[in-house]
Amino acid sequence: MAKYISALQRIEAMFQSAIEISKKYEIIMVTSNENHTDNTNDYSDNSVKSEFFSDQEQNLIRQTLENIGFKVKQFFNEEDFISFISNPRENLSKYIVLNSAQKGTKIGRKSLIPSLCDLYSVKYIGSNPYIVSLCRDKYRTSCILKQHGIST
């Protein structure tokens, strides 16, 4: 008879795994924040600022990661992260990037950080730059899905 692991046991196993990972890696958070990210090139009708984190949300994410055991570096815009990653003063292989930054207004704005991570061989959480850009292009995504018999 197969042994079933309870949801609580699975959560505990994931938590223990995260603790082990925190011993090897640090987290870099690249996020847009409503109080710390300047975005002068915003859309007027559909502001990208609606997707920015509040200070409270930002702090909750950071505190959760730190409570697990991760050291966390914080960047509130892409430019500061670009300066850090392109002029490394330390080993970049010890980092995992958690990205939710999107300061720009063009279609590829969410693929910038994953592209740089790929260029500098830095691990990151989330989709690769191609998938991010493809999924942001609703027309092309819809065409691909229709080609495979999936209606949109």
Over which residues does each language-model region extend?
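Short, glycine-/small-residue-rich phosphate/pyrophosphate-handling segment
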Residues: D137-T152
